[in-house]
């Protein structure tokens, strides 16, 4: 039974299924594969396996290519598009056109500033500033550091770096010796970090986005007995390294935070609940939805014995998943349908059925000009620390 005021939309395929597009831009790393697999697994989970036709489209890193693909999806009668957008601004006109045609746009992780789209993202939860402060704390406020960034021009990379620089600029003793784009990929991060180490072998710390395990490999390749404090994202290899006593003795310390692939699953389920009339659509000025920031120190690393996050575990044994596997694929409260095979292969969990999201699942994200809104004012406490406290004064 539908709640009062909720009316289901009408599916557009000939067989009565919802036509849903999974639109990727950059797709060259484990995170992107896992996020896409989560959506695929959910779409194959009853009852969606009988009601959803899911079509995956990979556009690449050229905004014009994703614009063209969006236009084709709209023309083909899409009911919904769940997407990792390549640009926060370049896609806006096409997104608005799609909204006017009745298409629901749900962006995950990366964001757009067209307010008719839903942005489901941890981007505003403070990764950049909190991890930067954690690194400053580890270094005692002084030292040479590298910045290992993501994909040029993407809103996620820009927001992370802006937040980090807000902190680093407060500490005159912090010197940014090298800054490079690593495309959120272990191999590229290792290559770019190795280049930076050739020029600055005395680096004291590394602030990294996804691909951080590659930075550890570059450090060990340069000097097998020397590691440095690092902050990074959620790769399984990085979490295992943080908890490795041998690596700690060589100098490794830090925190694992960053982007959960599970954001894609929340975006997909929210979109489906709205299409099915189980949840009201939100006013356009309330469509920025915040996903919480994971935060795991060496002391917090706990190995999982099974194929899901249970009993507070957050990392898998090294012989179970690749080092590049992004751990934050599960959310037992929001995505109980998923298992390890869902993230690795896009397959549904045997016996699982789609469970409704909690009624109060939506947490409004703050507006950030150029990131998730246009013609809006940023909050005064935009880069306020929310997870870590300074232990050294600027």
Predicted regions: what is each one?
Residues 58, 112-137, 147-152, 179, ...:
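Short beta-strand elements at the ligand-binding edges of bilobed clamshell
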Residues 2-17, 268-394:
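Hinge/cleft segment of the Venus flytrap/periplasmic-binding protein
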Residues 71, 75, 79-100, 164, ...:
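Hydrophobic alpha-helical
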Residues 20-29, 33-41, 129-179, 271-308:
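An alpha-beta-alpha
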Residues 20-24, 32, 55-56, 80-84, ...:
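Structural recognition of the beta-strand scaffold that forms the well-ordered cores
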Residues 5-6, 15-47, 53-67, 84-88, ...:
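Extracytoplasmic "Venus flytrap"
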Residues 88-126, 144, 237-241:
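Flexible loop/hinge segments that line or gate small-molecule binding clefts
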Residues 5-6, 66, 120-145, 159, ...:
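Hydrophobic alpha-helical segments within soluble ligand-binding/sensing domains
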């Amino acid at each position: 039974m539908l709640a009062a005021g909720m009316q289901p939309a009408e599916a557009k395929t000939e067989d009565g299924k919802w036509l849903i597009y999974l639109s990727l831009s950059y797709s060259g790393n484990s995170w992107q594969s896992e996020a896409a697999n989560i959506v695929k697994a959910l779409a194959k989970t009853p009852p969606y396996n009988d009601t959803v036709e899911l079509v995956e489209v990979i556009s690449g890193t050229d905004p014009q290519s994703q614009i063209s693909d969006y236009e084709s999806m709209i023309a083909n009668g899409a009911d919904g598009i769940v997407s990792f957008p390549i640009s926060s601004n370049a896609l806006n006109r096409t997104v608005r056109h799609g909204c006017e045609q009745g298409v629901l746009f749900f962006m995950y992780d990366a964001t757009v500033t067209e307010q008719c789209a839903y942005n489901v993202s941890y981007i505003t939860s403070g990764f950049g500033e909190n991890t930067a402060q954690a690194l400053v704390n580890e270094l005692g406020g002084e030292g040479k550091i590298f910045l290992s960034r993501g994909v040029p021009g993407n809103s996620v990379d820009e927001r992370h770096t802006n937040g980090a620089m807000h902190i680093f600029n407060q500490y005159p003793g912090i010197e940014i010796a090298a800054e490079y784009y690593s495309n959120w990929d272990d191999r590229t991060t290792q290559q770019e970090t190795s280049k930076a180490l050739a020029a600055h072998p005395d680096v004291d710390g590394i602030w990294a986005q996804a691909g951080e395990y590659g930075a550890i490999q570059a450090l060990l390749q340069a000097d097998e007995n020397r590691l440095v404090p690092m902050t990074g994202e959620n790769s399984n290899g990085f979490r295992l390294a943080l908890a490795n006593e041998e690596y700690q003795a060589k100098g490794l310390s830090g925190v694992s935070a960053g982007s959960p692939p599970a954001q894609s699953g929340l975006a997909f389920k929210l979109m489906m609940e709205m299409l099915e009339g189980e949840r009201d659509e939100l006013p356009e000025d309330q469509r920025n939805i915040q996903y919480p920031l994971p935060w795991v120190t060496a002391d917090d690393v706990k190995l999982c014995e099974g194929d899901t996050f249970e009993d507070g575990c957050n990392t898998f044994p090294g012989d179970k998943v690749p080092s590049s596997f992004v751990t934050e694929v599960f959310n037992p409260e929001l995505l109980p349908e998923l298992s390890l095979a869902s993230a690795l292969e896009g397959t549904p969990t045997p016996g699982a059925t789609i469970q409704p999201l909690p009624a109060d699942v939506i947490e409004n994200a703050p507006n950030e000009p150029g990131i998730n809104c246009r013609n809006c004012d940023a909050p005064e406490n935009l880069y306020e620390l929310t997870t870590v406290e300074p232990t050294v004064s600027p």
